[in-house]
Amino acid sequence: MQRAGSSGARGECDISGTGRLRLEQAARLGGRAVHTSPTGGLGARQVAGMSAKERPKGKVIKDSVTLLPCFYFVELPILASSVVSLYFLELTDVFKPVHSGFSCYDRSLSMPYIEPTQEAIPFLMLLSLAFAGPAITIMVGEGILYCCLSKRRNGAGLEPNINAGGCNFNSFLRRAVRFVGVHVVGLCSTALITDIIQLATGYQAPYFLTVCKPMYTSLEGSCKENSYIVEEICSGSDLTVINNGKKSFPSQHATLAAFAAVYVSMYFNSTLTDSSKLLKPLLVFTFIICGIICGLTRITQYKNHPVDVYCGFLIGGGIALYLGLYAVGNFLPSEDSMLQHRDALRSLTDLNQDPSRVLSAKNGSSGDGIAHTEGILNRNHRDASSLTNLKRANADVEIITPRSPMGKESMVTFSNTLPRANTPSVEDPVRRNASIHASMDSARSKQLLTQWKSKNESRKMSLQVMDSEPEGQSPPRSIEMRSSSEPSRVGVNGDHHVPGNQYLKIQPGTVPGCNNSMPAGPRVSIQSRPGSSQLVHIPEETQENISTSPKSSSARAKWLKAAEKTVACNRGNNQPRIMQVIAMSKQQGVLQSSPKNAEGSTVTCTGSIRYKTLTDHEPSGIVRVEAHPENNRPIIQIPSSTEGEGSGSWKWKAPEKSSLRQTYELNDLNRDSESCESLKDSFGSGDRKRKHIDSNEHHHHGITTIRVTPVEGSEIGSETLSVSSSRDSTLRRKGNIILIPERSNSPENTRNIFYKGTSPTRPYKD
C-alpha cells in the first residue's frame, strides 16, 4: 500500500480527515492504517522518513471532550454578555447615574471642562491600547516561546496537543487563546465593575458645575439658606456630558490602565527567563508607567478627583492579580502546575523511593567514605551495637577497647550515670580504639572538684615513708596536668587530637634506685574548660558478653569480698582514692600485720616499687596510668610522707638496682599487668557495712579510667613497705572512685571493674 500525506495532514484541523492525529497514529502503528490524500501521495520511504522525523519531537496528543463545549457555551457567552453590557453602559444613556446633591458654588466642582477630542488619552484610545497592546504582546511572546520550545529534543516544555472535535490544538494556540481571552474578559469585567460603581455612587466630576450650569434662582430659598442642593437645577444643553459628569468615582481610565499593566507584567515575570537581566524589568516598568500616566492625566485635565484615580488603580490591579493567579495559573503550563502540586502533596515514602532524589554514591570519594564506615562497623561491632543501649538523650560516651585479648570472662559494672554494655565483642585485632563522647555539666564538675580540693587541703595530707633507703635515687620527674579547652578525641587508629592548652606541672620526688632506673615519670592529663562538657573515658576490658553464669556470679562475689578487704589499705592510709585503687590493683604480696595505730589495725603491702601519693590537684577529666610489668609483678603502694614531703608530689622508691622503667599514663586501663592476689586486714563488720552501703549508692559524676601499660621489665626485688595512718584521716573523694581488682593470669580468671562515683551533694566522711 502506498503511503500518502498532504498539506492537510500538517494543518491544525483537516476537514477531509487527513489530520496530523491520524498520521501520527499511523506512524506509531508502523504505517499500517494509512489513508490516501486527495491531492496526491508520497512514496512509502518518504512518509516513513517524515513520520520518523516528527516522532522525536514527541508531541503528545490528548483527547478532550469538554474543551469545545466549554468554550462555546460558557466562555463565549460570558465574553459576549460583558461586551454587550459594556456597550449599553458606556455608549448609551439607558442606565443613568443616581442624582446626588452638591453645594452652592462649590469650587472643587467648578473646574473647566475639556472636550473629549482634546483629552490626552481619549476613552476609545484607552480601550484600544488596553485591549490591543497586551493582547498583541502576549501573542508575540507565545509565538516566540513556541518556536524556541519546539526546537528542543522531543519538544520538552511544550504543553500536549489537544484533540477536540477532530481539530488538533497545539500549545501555542491554546495558550494564546487562554491568556488573551482572560485578558479581554478581565478588561470587560473591570469596565463593568467601574461603571456599576459609578452609576451607584453618582459622584460628581471636577467639571460638573461647569457643564451643569445650575439655576440657583429656581430654588425656593437662597444658597445661603440652602447651601446643599439636592434638586435637579441643571440648565445645560448636553445631557450626555452632564451624565458623564456624575460618573467620576472610580476613574475608568485608572481601572482599565491598571488592569492591563498588572496583567501583562505578570505575564512577563512568569514567561521570560533570567537569561536577559534587563529585558524583563524594562518591559514591566514600561507597562506600569504607562498605566500610571493614563490615570494621572485624568487628574491634570480635571476629569476625576485624585481619590477617584487612586481607587481605580486599586480596583484594576486587584482584578488583574486575581485573574492572573487563579484564572490562568500565573501563566505557567498546566502540566507543570500539576507536577508542582503533586510534588507538594507527595509523601515522604514516595520521596525516599524516588530515584531522582536519591544521592548516588558511585564516585570514588563517597564510595571510599562509605566503605570506610562499613569497615569500622564491622571491626567494632560491639561498640556500634552498644550505642543502641544508650538511653540518655545527651549521652556521648567514649569507649576505649582493649588492645589485647583479655580473660575468658569479664564483668563490667557501671553506676546509673552510664548504661551497661551487654553486647558481645566482634573485634578485629587491628581495631584499637572507638570513641564515643559523654557530656557532663562542667559547672557541676568544677564545683565537685573544688569541694574535693578544699576538703583535701583542710586535712593537710602528709606522706610518710616507713622505709628509709637513701641510696640509688633517680632524677626527679614532673607530672603534667593539662587543662584543655577541647576534649581529647581518640580516633579509630588510636591517634589523639588534642589542641594546645595550659599545663600545671607538679614536681615529684625522686625514685630510689632498684634494678632498673626509672627516668620517666607519670603524666596526668586533666582536660577541662569553663562552660564546656568534660570527656569521660570508659575502658572496656571485656570482649565477651556479660554472662549470668554461676561462674561469673561466683567471680563477682569473690571480687566483692576482695573489695571489702581493701578497706584496710583505704583506712590505714591518708592517700587519695585513686592511688589506693592503683595500689590495690597492683599488689601481689600478702599483707603483713603490725601494730601501728590505736585500733590495732595494721596494713603491710609488699612490692618491688614504692610510690608516694599524688598531689592535691583535683583529678578531674582524664587520668591515665601505664605500667609495664612484663615478667615481674610490681606493686604500687602510696605511703605517707614523714620527711616533710607533704607537698603532694610523687616519689618513686624501688630496690637498689635501677634497671626497671615503668610509665604510668592516665586514661588507659590495665592491659597485661597482674592483679593483687590477697589482702589481709583486721577491720570489723561495721566498716564492711559502711563500705557496702557506699558501693550501693548511685552517683551522677564522671568516671576516671586507668590503663596500666607495660614498657619494659626486668628483675625487681621484692621489699616490704608498711604504711599506717589514723583512721580519721581517710579521704573520701568527692570525685570519682574506681575499684579495679584484678585476678591472676589463669585461664579461668575474671576481672570485675566497679565504677563508683559519689553523690554530688554527699558530704565527706571521716
From Swiss-Prot:
- What SUPFAM superfamilies is this protein classified in? Acid phosphatase/Vanadium-dependent haloperoxidase
Q: Which UniProt keywords apply?
A: Cell membrane, Glycoprotein, Membrane, Phosphoprotein, Postsynaptic cell membrane, Synapse, Transmembrane, Transmembrane helix
Expression by tissue, per the entry, reads: Specifically expressed in neurons (at protein level).
What positions are modified (Phosphoserine)? 37, 347, 386, 439, 462, 474, 608
Write out the biased-composition intervals (Polar residues). 743-752
Show the GO MF annotations: lipid phosphatase activity; lysophosphatidic acid phosphatase activity; phosphatidate phosphatase activity
Location in the cell reads: Postsynaptic density membrane
Give the chief site where it resides: membrane
Q: Name one GO cellular component term.
A: Schaffer collateral - CA1 synapse
Q: Where is the composition biased (Basic residues)?
A: 688-702
Family statement drawn from the similarity comment of this UniProt entry:
Belongs to the PA-phosphatase related phosphoesterase family.
Q: What is this protein called?
A: Phospholipid phosphatase-related protein type 4
What is the originating organism of this protein? Rattus norvegicus
- Name of the gene: Plppr4
